[in-house]
Structure formats: structure tokens, C-alpha cells
Amino acid sequence: MSEFHRLYFDELLFDFPDLVKVQKDSYASFVGGGDAVSSINDIFASVFPVNDGYGRASLEFVSCRMGEPKHDEYGCVERGITYSAPLRAILRLVVFGDETSGEGGEGVSTEPAVKDVREQEIYMGDIPIMSKNGTFIINGVERVVVSQMHRAPGVFFDNDKARSISGKLNYIARIIPYRGSWLDFEFDAKDVLYFRIDKKRKLPVTLLLRALGLSNKDIFAQFCEVSECRLTKDGKWTVCFVPERFKGVRLQYDLINAETGELVLAKGNRISIVLARNLYAKGLRYCYMDLEVMKDMYLADDLVSAKGEVLLPHGTRLTKEHVAKLEFLDVDSIKLVELKGNYIFSTVLQYDCSYEEAMLSIYRVIRPGEIPSIESAEKLFESLFFSPERYDLLNVGRIRLNAKFNLSHDESLTVLTKEDIFCTVRELALLQREVGDVDDIDHLGNSALGLRRVRSVGEFMDNQFRIGLVRMAKVIVENMATADFDTVMPCEMINSKILGAVIREFFMSSALSQFMDQTNPLSEITHKRRISALGPGGLNRGRAGFEVRDVHTTHYGRICATETPEGATIGLINSLAIYAKINKYGFIETPYRYVRDGRVTDEVTYLSAIDEIKANICQASVRVDEEGYILDDLVYCRRNYENVFIPRSEVQFADVSAKQIVSVAASLIPFLENDDANRALMGSNMQRQAVPLIVPEAPLVGTGMEGYVARGSGAVIVAKRAGIVQYIDARNIVVASESKDDFWIDSYTLCKFRKSNHNTCIHQRCVVYQGQRVKKGDILADGPAIQQGELALGRNLVVAFLSWRGYNFEDSVVISSNVVRDDLFTSVHLEGFECVVRDTRLGPEEITRDVSGVAEEFLHCLDEFGIACVGANVEAGDVLVGKVTPKSSSPVTPEEKLLRAIFGEKAIDVKDSSLYLPPGVSGCVVDVKVLQRRGIEKVGRALLIEKQAIDAEKARRDHELAVLTNYIYSLLKEMLVGKVALNTLAPISKGDLITGEALEKIDRESWWKLSVDEISSIKLLRQRFVDRFDEINKTYEENFEKIRGDDDLAQGVLMVVKVFVAVKHTLQPGDKMSGRHGNKGVISRIVPAEDMPYLADGTPVDIILNPLGVPSRMNVGQILETHLGWAAYNLGKKISKLLDEGNYSEVKSLILEIYKNDRKMMARLKRMTDTEIVEYSRSLRRGVPVAASVFEGPKTDEIERLLVLAGKDPSGQEVLYDGVTGEKFDRKVTVGCKYMLKLHHLVNDKIHARSIGSYSLITQQPLGGKSHFGGQRFGEMECWALQAYGATFALQEMLTIKSDDVVGRVNVYDSIVRGDNDFYYGVPESFNVMMNELRALCLNVEFCSDLERKEDFSDLPLAVSGR
């Protein structure tokens, strides 16, 4: 493969990660593999052991293992089955006897004795396996499990957004677990604090605090601000001055410093927080307290005299009498609590209760209608928040709680603690007092906590697996109740279908398990990197507001700000940014380079939104010298999500790349920074709709991301390790090691004409040659929409921005006939058709070529077995699979009786049920698959297909064995040459020196018979050869068995025949095209090349776009792309001309001039010889590829330099001539080279014409829609139009013979056949339908003409109105 190099205008400092690593790592955490540890064992351990409830037996988990899949990925797609592996677990049944195994301290039994132990390995179900590309194959269809962004477990604080009558916001707190009951706290308008469990009826928080075991004294200690007053020697009471407690207080007494005695502030003054802090800063620590102020305060602790007597209990409200007696009591200190602002204590005072009352009240709310006991209430309350079986915060929730409240609990503690609840209540009380801030749920991080996290496929599978095992455990308990433990085995208690059904339900019906978008490699990779806020446990798109959809500052480098759908889900479905990854807690991280002492280093670290808040981060474009030191004294940075200028010494991190804020699709748009955001969004989305073309072409103006996307998509074949290509053909590549010490063989199989989910063609082409050395990671074969290892979604066209005869009005596109003639935008689509052969009640259906009643012209593509031949050209209406179905016998006629009497057998009565090619489809049969039911002997075409598959496998095996044999014999030859022969083997005699020429005269298999000194090493080599030979043979024998194996088909199905037809779609008017900047349009006309506008040298343009489509859309990036593309295109023409002239010195100087600003390429060119430079220049004949990276593309002066170098006007405009008149246009026109895509909205899939077709059974009107081969509806408004013009006869035709007048239709047909113009109208069938509906209402309405006799109904006894 010739290497693909682009002209870069920036430097790539940080390589890209595996683009589907998110999916792979997440699923690996579930099933294990690589460095990941399987979580299946942990889930088993959390559910097992399962006890029968009576202490008779226990079923324990020992271990589990995953088996191997029955078929490979493609085999599952072919057969329409799930790519999965069996899960087997070793379970141990422990049966207990009546005896005890020991005694307690007083002779009480401790545990029953083990009577019997039985272990067994049990099949638990099939677990879907992720393919190497990060997808799942479910029922033969590739699916993707989209990652979901949801609220992270933990505590959230918010307000109700609506102010109360007093103008104050009421605050709420919510503790949300990953699994378990929600706990909400909220204030009402009267500042009373309530709590709810699972959004049930609210209760005063007193009940919760009492249930947690708190007394009033504990509540004072936990939630109240206690003021300790001390009695001085002169008989005055002093209190500690705390600025926060004096905030907003109007003094009721003179504020006097107790230490100095000076007056600080006079009575009546109001103290602000600023004033309070200033007083504290000036040394005010203690102040005198007036006894009158103590009135109405509460005792926080028992008032105890010096003798230890309790004078007043805690919680006592001080009255005038109490205050008056204080100076006479024998106390020197008192602890007081003020009711104002202490919402929790005020709630306790209003709604006080005992521990038992609290427990019973909570039980009644959780389980209304049940009669509670204190024991059951305690058990329920304990299980709600403190039981690991029913409550789980995950390590994320624990980390967030620890960070929010400065706790130090271990990550493994994933249940609530009392301290968590106390801290939440305390924080909420502070918020109600307007101290602190609420959380921003749209943050990916807020202060010291992250609020939104991502859960991927591994976590979903964890949850489903747990649900399945819990259900299975319930069934096990039920089975244990009736089991005979003397004989029962573990397998008899397990129903393996339960687990498989839960997992299958998730993959088949979950909103996050989606049919993979497989239009092109970019759509695949984008789908795998998608993050949805919808789905179970997520948002509802109908109720999601603007805030949650909007771009947030924390999305920087984590979620793409550009790529999102345009419809109702805008902002709810996003894509990961290029460099972003998800950490073990589910938070999205983005990489940054360390900056130390003003020097940007190459050391990279990943930061989440939590870690990033307090960091100073500069942009990737910051100016640095050669050693990485920042040049500017003040640097533009982000800190706490605000943009600030800071000294360079304070910079901590730098972005790794300017493009790290965009997604994969957006990073493929050159000059993205010059496009309006809405058009950039459209450009990102429309690239995913581009159809792979027959001859893909990489863009001349790319972004440098094309190669990374091609590799990451899995559409190309990449070398696993360095070696030499030993063999290639259209379907196989064999690479072997270059080293003879550690020999290996890698065999690669290419995909050929495989159908994708969206009917595009997956076809791989080999790009290496035999004998070529390849490195690890080199591309061996291109896939669909890939050229030379780079993504190639469209073609480079010469474009002119020009209004041309009205044909490009309103974004229409005019195309040259050259584009169609050269098949530049021709694509191949695969249509799959399936014929199912069933065993009916009257007998089995049969596949045959002998189909009665079908003309031979429709059977031309069938072989002798009745199945279409591969390579046959088929048209609409042709039979792809001939099939007949038995039908019930009709009464026997005398003629049939005579035939039976003569021939002695009954003629089988069958009907045609063949598979026909539907209307609007024509193409070539490229593949046929025949699947047969297990137990039925393979016949006909099935055997032929099986033989072809086995022959292909044998050929692949023979190639590998040939490579191995050549390698072994080359080693043997090296070992023999130069040695003395110890025996005779003609023409070598005993004692002769063995030479290479002599060995060539002997059959290679006979070389082993030669005896030399080092015979032991030769024997070891032969053993290695035999072992490796057997290993290869064994592998392929297993493949042969899989091919020969039967297929598991549905009940009653004998055979399934799948026929794949390749349909070629050429470009035609009505097809949709677009660029990469959101500039889309429909082809209005394909103009002959000679009529297209042409340049001064006679070159006609390929496509004409409307210049009015640029200013209003504000996607100026397409103009810059056009200019740069024009320079690249003409530089290629210039190089081609110099090569043809043989002027190699100018070629070299031109190449060096082009790449002079690309440091990496210049270093490479300096290492190349003149001959190598000329050879490289031959690959640039079609244009010099350039990379205009996002936010780091070439500036205007660089584009002008390249245009001048190419010999073009630096303005990018050219003189154009009209191809029709030959006249020059009035002014210069913008002409350039632009990358255009053909989208999958093809006119062939939308338009059709009906001549004859089916009718509706009831109304007898033609059906509607292309799938029913329907007609155009002449509706109500169209009738009005004909009425308005007075076209009565035309209207009558439309409503009768052209619609549902059955008799009239037949008459018209007869008239046409006879050549007459006379016909008459009948009654439309819809009129009869209306009449029958009236009769169904018991209204017998008859319509008569005026000429018919009218009956007299006057004598009938009818009720007359008004009598």
C-alpha cells in the first residue's frame, strides 16, 4: 500500500485513543478478559447462597466460566442467530441434618450439621458476546448499546423555583441511590421540615430523627447553634462573639466588649455580615449579654448546680421567672439555643413523638393497610437505607457524599449512614437560611462533586444479570419447598431460561439497545460513541427543558458542542469528544498537558469536571518556544469555567489539542471554525448519511482525522504484528513472521459483498502485495468508503458558484454528465430476500424449478434446484426461489377420476408461493445462503454451497500450511548445509559435505532422512513442525464441522433460502447531495458536459452550486475549502505536467516548496533520495492532499501562497465561459475543488409509477404507498380544485372509473381493447360502502330517479312529529 501523506499546517502532539474503547472496556468489566476482572462472580456472590427458609438446605455458588461461541460473528449473521457464549456455573447443594455441629455456651445448638454436599456444573444461559468492533449480533442483526448519561447517585440540593408568600425560596434535598428508596427533604411555607420516602406522603422530620435514635439533647448537639454564656466575677453574663450568628441582628442592648469594657456598638443598630467580620477582626471575641435577651431561648443542656443537682432539664424554654432566678442559682455557665433560624428544632417542638410512634408512622406510610408491630417496623426501616441487599449508592455515591460533607467513609460502604442523613439535614437548614448554593444538575461537575455520570453497556448488563439471578433465586426457593433433599440435584432447582429471557429482553426491547447505523464507517463509529440522556432512568424528551439540552461549560473536551440530532431529541443525544474517556466512576474525563514553571510538558493527565474546577488551564494554541516555555507574560486561561488572564507561572495545565472539544464527525469538517453552529451540526449529521461509492476517493482538503476514523471504525483490516505478506488473493491475506526464532502465521479473511444494516455494501479490497513488509498497525485491506486507509465518503469535484438558468434555484444542484458517465457517484446496494419453506398441515412445501402458471421468462435465473444462480441478472417480477405449497383438495371431477384410473396416482394439487423480485428492484445475484433444519438430509443447492465453503476453507488451510512448510524447510536447510553427512542419500554420500545444490536435487521430505552431528536439534525442529501442522489442521477441521453442521430454525420451518441482489444506483435527478458544511441540495438536472460552464483551458466544471446559499447560511468554511482545494488540485496538475515533461529537478523543488511549513514532512523529505522524491510525487498527480485541522487550519495568506504556487489567481476566482453560448460570463466566478457526498436519500427508493396494481378489498380503491405499489390519492382538496374550474367530466372520471367503479373499470378496458371511445359510468364502490354502513344502523335507504314511481307512505302508522 502506498503511504498517504497530507500537508499539515499544525502539529499533532497527542495520539488518538481507540475510538470504541468506551464500549469494549465497559463490557470487559462485565464478562472479564484482558486486564479486566469479571463482575459476574460478584453478582453471583451477592445473590447466593439461597436457603430454603427452614434450615434444611442451602444452594451455594462455587465458580462460573464462559464457554466458546458456537459460530463466529459472520456465521451468526448468516444464520440469523445471536453471537453468544454459554455461561456455566458450579453450584453446591448443602443438605443439613437434624443433628447440630456444636453447642453454645449453655448447650444451645449453634448450627445444624451438614448431612450431604452435592456439586454440579449447570448451564445458566447464553450471554451475548461483544464483537471485535464493539457491537452485538442479536438474531443475526448488529446492534449497539448506547451509553446513557444520568444523574449520579448521591445527594442533591435544589429549590422549588417558586417563591412563597413571604418572598422566600423553599429548599429541597434528595438522596438518590443507584438501587433502593429515594429520601427527600423539603420545607413548607411555614419553614417546617418534612421528609418523604419514595415520594410517598410527607412526614415531619422529627419522625425520622426519632427513628434514627436521637433525643432532644442529641438534636441540639447535631443541628443547633449552641451559645454558651458564662458568668463573670462582676455578675454579668458573657457570650462568644461569632460574626455569622450576629448577621442581620438589630441590637436590643449595647454591644460591649467583655474583655476591654468599651462600647462597640449602641443599642438599636443593625449588624451586617461585613460589620460583624470587621468587629471580629478588630479583636471583639466576647461581649456582654443582656438577661432580657435570654427570654424565650431554650436550654441546650441540663442546668446543673455546683452540687450536681439538675435545676432545669434540657429543652426548657426560659421564661421571665427563669431568667430572674439565674443570678441566684448556683451556676456559672449556661448553654442556650435560639429558636429563630433553628428550623429543625422548631419542627421537633411542633411535631414531637417517641421512638415507637415514629417507627410505626413510617411503617404505615410505606405499607398502608398492614397492621404494624414495632419489630416489623424496625426491620423495614433498617432494610430501606441500611441493607446492602436493598440499597446501593455505588462507590460513586459514597465518594460524592464524602466529598460534599467532608466525610471519610470507605468507598466500599455503599449504604447510607446516620451521619449522611444528619449532614444532609444540616446542609438543607443552612440553605434555608440562605447560606450556600444549590446544585446545577446540568453540570458534569459542581464544586467538589459530579452530578451527571455515564453508564455504559457493562453496567446495564450488570443490572440485567442481577435481575435475572434474583428471579432465579425466587424460583429456587419455590422448588426447594417441594424438593426431596435425599435425591435432588442442583440442576433440578435451576430454570436456565429465566436469566436468558431477561438478557434477551434488554437487547431486544430496551430503548438503549439500538439497530446499528451502518450506512458508512463514520455512522458506525458515531453510533458507538453516542451518549443519550433518554431511556430507562433518564429524561423524557417531552418534558426535558432548555437548560438540560443546552451546551454547558463543563462539556468542554468531554461532550461535543456541535453534534446532536435536529429533532425533538436535540441536546438530549450527544457524542463523546475525540479524546474523552470515561473513568471507573462513570465521569467523563478529558486530557491535559502539565505546565510546570511556565513550561508546557509532554506529560498528559486526564481530568474530570470535578478536578478541573480549581485548575488554571490555557489553550493548546498558546505561544511557546522550542523548549516549550510559554512566551506571553499574561496567558488567557480557564478557571472555574470562566475566562481570565493570569501570569504564566500560575498556569497548571494546557489543552492537548484545539480539536479536543469536538466529536469524531465534527472533526472531519475542514474550516469548522468558519461555519455557523447550526450548519456545522447539519454537516456532522449528513456525513453519517453518505453512501459508500464504488470507487471511493479521499478528500483533497481533509482534517487529518480521516486515517484515525478509518482505523477506529473496524472497516479496514489492520496488521496484528510486523511481518511479511506471504500470500494474497481476493478473499485472503496471509502474513508470516520475518523472524525465524519466533515463527507465527496470521490469516485474514476479507468481507465480500456483505449486506449492512442499511443495505449498503460492505466490501474489502486488498492494498498490499505479496512479499511486502508490513508493520504492526499497517492497513492490509480497505473497506467501504475508505481509500488507502483514509475515510473517503464522497468525491472531489470541480465546483463553480454560479446561478445557471434557474436550475440551481433554492439549493438545487446542477451536475455534469461526465460525473455520471465516469460513475463517480455510483453506489452498490444489497437487497436481501428470504424464502421460508414450512411443513404445512397438508404436507411440506417444496423448492422446485417447475412452477406451474409462471412463464419461462421469469424463471430464467433459476438453477435445476429452483434457486437463483449467483451472477444472474434479475429484473422486477423474476422468480428468485421457486416454491410450491400444497393446497386443500377440491371435489374430484369425472375427468380426474379417469386420469387416476389410467395412471393409478393422484395429481398433487399445489399453488405457487415463489419468492419474486419486488417492483422497482433490478440487479445481480451476488450470494445465496441455504439454511436447513437439523435432522433433514441436505440436498441440491445446500450441498453445493457447503462444498464451496469447505473448498474455500481448505484453500485457506493449504496457504497457511504452504507458508509453514517453506519456513520449516528453510530452517532445516540452514541446519544441514555445511554439515558432514553420516549416511548416504543419493546424490549425497556418507562423509560428503552437504551443499544447497545437492539438497535441491533431493525431494524435500527426504531431507529428514539425512543424519548429521546435530541430529537432536533436527528432531526437535521436526516435532515443532508436526505440532504446528496438527494445530492448523485441527483448527480447520473444527471450521469444517461448523460448515457441515445443521441450523437451528424456528418450529415448523424446514429450510430458509436467502438471496442477496446487488443493485447499482447511478446519480440521477432527485438524488440528494451535500458538502461537509451543512450545504445540502437535490440534483435538478444532469447537463451534457459540453453545455456546462468551462474554464479558459476548456475544462468543464463538474457541479454548479448557487452562491446565494452561502451568505444566509453563514457556512463560509465551504468557500475556504473550495479555494484550498483549487490550490491542491492545480498543484497536482502542475506536478503531473512536470513529470510528463521529465523535469524532475523542478518537481523536487516544487515538492519542497509545497511542504516547507510542514516540519514532519520536511524532515522525511530530507531523508529521501531524489529518486524517492520523484516516485512519491507520482502519487500527487490527482492533487496534493492537505489537512485543515479544526481550529488549526491554514490562514488566508497560506492559501494564497499555495494558489500562487499552483499558478492560479490568489482571489480563487476564474474566468468562466457559458457552454451553451460560448460567451464569457460578465465577471469572474469562484471556482474550486470541493468534496461532495451522495446521501442515502435516493430517488429510486422514493418514487415509483403504478400502471396496474392491487385494490383495497372493501373500498376497491387503489392502495397507497410504494411498498403496496399504490397510486396517487386524488383527495378532497384536489376535487375542490376541479370543481372550481368546472371540469365536471374530469372530476367524474376521477371519482369513478379511475378510482373504485369496478364495473366501469372493466368497461373502459373493453373499450380500449376494441378501440372504441364509448364507455359508461357505474356506481362507485365507496358509495356502496356508505349504503351498507347506513343499513348497519337499521336505515334502509333507497335512491330512486325522478322517472321512477314514488310510493305513497301516507297510510302507514308512522309517528308524526308534533302530534
Curated annotation (Swiss-Prot):
<dbReference type="GO" id="GO:0003899">
    <property type="term" value="F:DNA-directed RNA polymerase activity"/>
</dbReference>
<comment type="similarity">
    <text>Belongs to the RNA polymerase beta chain family.</text>
</comment>
<dbReference type="InterPro" id="IPR007641">
    <property type="entry name" value="RNA_pol_Rpb2_7"/>
</dbReference>
<dbReference type="InterPro" id="IPR037034">
    <property type="entry name" value="RNA_pol_Rpb2_2_sf"/>
</dbReference>
<dbReference type="InterPro" id="IPR042107">
    <property type="entry name" value="DNA-dir_RNA_pol_bsu_ext_1_sf"/>
</dbReference>
<dbReference type="Pfam" id="PF04561">
    <property type="entry name" value="RNA_pol_Rpb2_2"/>
</dbReference>
<keyword id="KW-0240">DNA-directed RNA polymerase</keyword>
<keyword id="KW-0804">Transcription</keyword>
<dbReference type="GO" id="GO:0000428">
    <property type="term" value="C:DNA-directed RNA polymerase complex"/>
</dbReference>
<dbReference type="Pfam" id="PF10385">
    <property type="entry name" value="RNA_pol_Rpb2_45"/>
</dbReference>
<dbReference type="InterPro" id="IPR007645">
    <property type="entry name" value="RNA_pol_Rpb2_3"/>
</dbReference>
<protein>
    <recommendedName>
        <fullName>DNA-directed RNA polymerase subunit beta</fullName>
        <ecNumber>2.7.7.6</ecNumber>
    </recommendedName>
</protein>
<dbReference type="Pfam" id="PF04563">
    <property type="entry name" value="RNA_pol_Rpb2_1"/>
</dbReference>
<dbReference type="InterPro" id="IPR019462">
    <property type="entry name" value="DNA-dir_RNA_pol_bsu_external_1"/>
</dbReference>
<dbReference type="Pfam" id="PF00562">
    <property type="entry name" value="RNA_pol_Rpb2_6"/>
</dbReference>
<comment type="subunit">
    <text>The RNAP catalytic core consists of 2 alpha, 1 beta, 1 beta' and 1 omega subunit. When a sigma factor is associated with the core the holoenzyme is formed, which can initiate transcription.</text>
</comment>
<dbReference type="InterPro" id="IPR007120">
    <property type="entry name" value="DNA-dir_RNAP_su2_dom"/>
</dbReference>
<dbReference type="InterPro" id="IPR007121">
    <property type="entry name" value="RNA_pol_bsu_CS"/>
</dbReference>
<dbReference type="InterPro" id="IPR037033">
    <property type="entry name" value="DNA-dir_RNAP_su2_hyb_sf"/>
</dbReference>
<dbReference type="GO" id="GO:0032549">
    <property type="term" value="F:ribonucleoside binding"/>
</dbReference>
<dbReference type="InterPro" id="IPR014724">
    <property type="entry name" value="RNA_pol_RPB2_OB-fold"/>
</dbReference>
<dbReference type="InterPro" id="IPR007642">
    <property type="entry name" value="RNA_pol_Rpb2_2"/>
</dbReference>
<dbReference type="Pfam" id="PF04565">
    <property type="entry name" value="RNA_pol_Rpb2_3"/>
</dbReference>
<dbReference type="GO" id="GO:0003677">
    <property type="term" value="F:DNA binding"/>
</dbReference>
<comment type="function">
    <text>DNA-dependent RNA polymerase catalyzes the transcription of DNA into RNA using the four ribonucleoside triphosphates as substrates.</text>
</comment>
<keyword id="KW-0808">Transferase</keyword>
<dbReference type="InterPro" id="IPR015712">
    <property type="entry name" value="DNA-dir_RNA_pol_su2"/>
</dbReference>
<dbReference type="Pfam" id="PF04560">
    <property type="entry name" value="RNA_pol_Rpb2_7"/>
</dbReference>
<dbReference type="InterPro" id="IPR010243">
    <property type="entry name" value="RNA_pol_bsu_bac"/>
</dbReference>
<keyword id="KW-0548">Nucleotidyltransferase</keyword>
<dbReference type="InterPro" id="IPR007644">
    <property type="entry name" value="RNA_pol_bsu_protrusion"/>
</dbReference>
<dbReference type="GO" id="GO:0006351">
    <property type="term" value="P:DNA-templated transcription"/>
</dbReference>
